[in-house]
């Protein structure tokens, strides 16, 4: 894994300077094709003429070595690095290749030694500094950045702060990465830097900065998939849905080499849902569910999103079905998770009448009862929800169905020393219900006791004042 990390950072992120050999050199291209197509046992024989013709050309020898390294043939890659060194002992790219070979073998210490030699022989080669810094970053990103500062004096034309930002980004030090990038003139940033900055901003909730950088990049290349994706995500998170849908379309239909992921479908579904395009949202969430089939947690999250979309559409049966699937598969369901199912039932009941409505409210009550049993620390929450459901089952309060739950809630909350505003609001609701209940029962003394308690919490409560004859 270390090797993969080092090579990805060193090869994919670096872009300020390519090795000194020309990528389009005919000899390297020809050799690379042979290496890809020939078995390891006979490849050197197949390369004989090319090597003979270029035995004094260290750039070609290093190019051949890189071709072997790309095929994970570290033995022959190192051989050609050594051949290049033998031809020119001061040729820095040969030492960089040797370092890359050691990285592929997970020997960071040996790789560091080769990169240091490359720095020694060519103090102006940014590859050597950056790759050496990537070895150091595992131990100390700050030390790695300090190493890059040596390059600043050697190559004032290089945006060293951008290189430092890459180190911080690869070390998941996102704020420091952004701060380093902000020291660099935008015009000197390469595509990878624009992507890094925009991604760092997105991940660290600096959405406007992320969006601004993504849009800056899109001015250069409107078909860049990563930048269209980040613009789409940020606009969705910011609730700017028209813009979100615009960039979603650009990601899906007007980006080069876009690999659409489950996250993309999920975000598209959220944007459609926010725009009340429920059928489109459902379609996208189903595509996300398929794309995320290998990830149980992501797929389960998509089931909840499908439930939300069906609920918004008014399709309560599907909303309940997907939510129940979500609850079955969530690792550690919370009280809020369970309450979500009850909420769907209460929403469904509000659209019904008669016995059908009563049956649905009873299902909601059953869910909230289960909530209180499974999560005793949330018993006040459960009693509050059950009180409301039972109030709906007994709208004229004649049966007092909500009474035991409001009594339990009031008994608990009145003894709570550190009540917050939510607690006080619920306590007032409980006292008001109980005051009205006893008023209907013509037990004025008990009713007045509850109305007075309402005024203790809310001295300006008009209902309580009227009940007590104060108005």
Regions found by a protein language model. Give the residues of each.
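Alpha-solenoid helical repeat scaffolds
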Residues: 2-8, 12-440, 463-471
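Alpha-helical oligomerization segments
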Residues: 444-469
């Amino acid at each position: 894994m270390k090797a993969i990390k080092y090579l990805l950072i060193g090869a994919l992120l670096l872009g300020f300077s390519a090795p000194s050999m020309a990528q389009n050199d005919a000899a390297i291209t020809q050799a690379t094709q042979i290496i890809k197509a020939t078995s390891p046992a006979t490849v050197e024989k197949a390369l004989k003429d090319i090597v003979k013709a270029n035995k004094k050309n260290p750039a070609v020898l290093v190019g051949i070595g890189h071709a072997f390294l790309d095929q994970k043939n570290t033995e022959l890659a190192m051989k050609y690095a050594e051949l290049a060194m033998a031809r020119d002992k001061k040729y820095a790219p040969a030492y960089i290749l040797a370092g890359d070979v050691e990285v592929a073998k997970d020997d960071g210490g040996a790789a560091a030694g080769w990169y240091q030699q490359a720095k020694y022989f060519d103090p102006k080669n940014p590859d050597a500094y950056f790759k050496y810094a990537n070895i150091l970053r595992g131990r100390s990103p700050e030390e790695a950045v300090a190493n890059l500062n040596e390059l600043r004096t050697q190559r004032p034309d290089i945006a060293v702060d951008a290189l430092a930002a890459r180190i911080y980004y690869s070390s998941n030090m996102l704020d420091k990465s952004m701060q380093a990038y902000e020291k660099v003139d935008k015009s000197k940033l390469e595509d990878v830097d624009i992507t890094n900055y925009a991604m760092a901003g997105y991940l660290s909730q600096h959405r406007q900065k992320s969006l601004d950088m993504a849009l800056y990049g899109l001015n250069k290349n409107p078909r860049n998939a990563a930048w269209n994706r980040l613009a789409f995500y940020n606009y969705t998170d910011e609730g700017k849905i028209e813009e979100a849908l615009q960039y979603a379309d650009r990601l899906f239909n007007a980006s080069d080499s876009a690999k659409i992921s489950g996250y993309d479908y999920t975000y598209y579904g959220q944007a459609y849902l926010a725009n009340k395009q429920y059928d489109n949202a459902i379609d996208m969430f189903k595509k996300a569910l398929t794309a995320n089939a290998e990830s149980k947690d992501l797929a389960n999250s998509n089931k909840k999103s499908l439930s939300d979309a069906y609920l918004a559409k008014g399709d309560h049966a599907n909303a309940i079905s997907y939510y129940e699937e979500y609850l079955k598969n969530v690792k550690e369901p919370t009280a809020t998770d369970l309450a979500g199912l009850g909420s769907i039932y209460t929403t469904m009941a509000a659209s019904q009448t008669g016995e059908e409505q009563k049956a649905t409210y009873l299902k909601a009550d059953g869910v909230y009862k289960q909530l209180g049993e499974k999560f005793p620390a949330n018993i006040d929450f459960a009693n509050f929800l059950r009180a409301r459901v039972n109030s709906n089952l007994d709208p004229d309060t004649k049966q007092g169905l909500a009474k035991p739950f409001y009594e339990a809630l009031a008994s608990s909350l009145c003894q709570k020393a550190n009540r917050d505003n939510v607690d006080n609001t619920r306590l007032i609701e409980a006292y008001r219900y109980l005051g009205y209940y006893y008023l209907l029962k013509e037990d004025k003394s008990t009713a007045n006791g509850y109305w007075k308690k309402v005024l203790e919490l809310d001295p300006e409560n008009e209902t309580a004042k009227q009940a007590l004859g104060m108005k």
